Amino acid sequence: MKILLANPRGFCAGVDRAISIVERALELYQPPIYVRHEVVHNRFVVEGLKQRGARFVEELNEVPDDNIVIFSAHGVSQAVRQEAKERSLTVFDATCPLVTKVHMEVARASRKHMEVVLIGHAGHPEVEGTMGQYASDTGGMYLVEKPEDVVSLQAKVKDPSNLHYVSQTTLSVDETADVIDELRRVFPKIQGPRKDDICYATQNRQDAVRILAEQVDVMVVVGSKNSSNSTRLKELAEKLGTPGYLIDCPQDIDPEWFVDAQLIGVTAGASAPEELVNQILDRIKELGATSVEEVLGREENMFFEVPKELQIKQVD
């Protein structure tokens, strides 16, 4: 039994930046440091930050006055930003710059009183934050998830000639393309972003799974169940005909998965650390894997700076 390791996998630049922001804030300002929502969707990472003094909350009313709060990588609505400002909370923004790009697209469309369609999953914090960028009283913003959702928009959209679409950054590339095709069919004049909203890391990790799924008998995806991009990797493997399993830790592995397997694929979502991947590999070796081969893939060199305040403090 052999393991094929996907490349690229694991942390993306946005996740790396978000975690660094929490770590530096803890070092410089001392705990507790409050974080609105899980800074990234990974249980291993969140538990580690909790042990160091981070306190994760869902709403700003859980943050005491005169404290620091960090916004998660998924972004927040303008209403949340305004609330933090009114309470004079010290804010460090860990929103992924690629999510911020989508926020700016929505805000720009809102100022032009265009209607906006967001392709995304209801209830996901990134979707809530993106929807919360829209402020036009005369337009409207609508959420769709599947191509079948698009037809119902015909009764809602006021001006099909003044319509714009954006998407959640962590979706399935193929499924998003299907929704966009349907939007363009139903609304021929709809406008979209100059560059695809699906983030580079989401695209690259899905491409790596496509390569791996053709070769392996089983695909193991390291990531938490509330991680959108990790879930999409599992779903993609299954769509390509390979059994996929999404796991948070080595203890989640069922030896039965590998009974008839000769090649096991392993990848990790953008919020899963390499330390956790190594633990998973060790467990699969205990179950009989004799070697690990890393598959060649697209090289990533993206890097996002942390806020200047934390950079300056670190120098001092």
Swiss-Prot record:
Record gene name: ispH
Source organism (scientific name): Vibrio cholerae serotype O1 (strain ATCC 39315 / El Tor Inaba N16961)
Residues binding (2E)-4-hydroxy-3-methylbut-2-enyl diphosphate, per UniProt: H41, H74, H124, T169, S227, S228, N229, S271
Alphabetical GO biological process terms: dimethylallyl diphosphate biosynthetic process; isopentenyl diphosphate biosynthetic process, methylerythritol 4-phosphate pathway; terpenoid biosynthetic process
GO cellular component terms given for this protein: cytosol
Name of the featured protein: 4-hydroxy-3-methylbut-2-enyl diphosphate reductase
Protein residues bound to isopentenyl diphosphate: H41, H74, H124, S227, S228, N229, S271
Pathway assignment: Isoprenoid biosynthesis; dimethylallyl diphosphate biosynthesis; dimethylallyl diphosphate from (2E)-4-hydroxy-3-methylbutenyl diphosphate: step 1/1; Isoprenoid biosynthesis; isopentenyl diphosphate biosynthesis via DXP pathway; isopentenyl diphosphate from 1-deoxy-D-xylulose 5-phosphate: step 6/6
One Pfam family named in its UniProt record: LYTB
Residues engaged in binding [4Fe-4S] cluster: C12, C96, C199
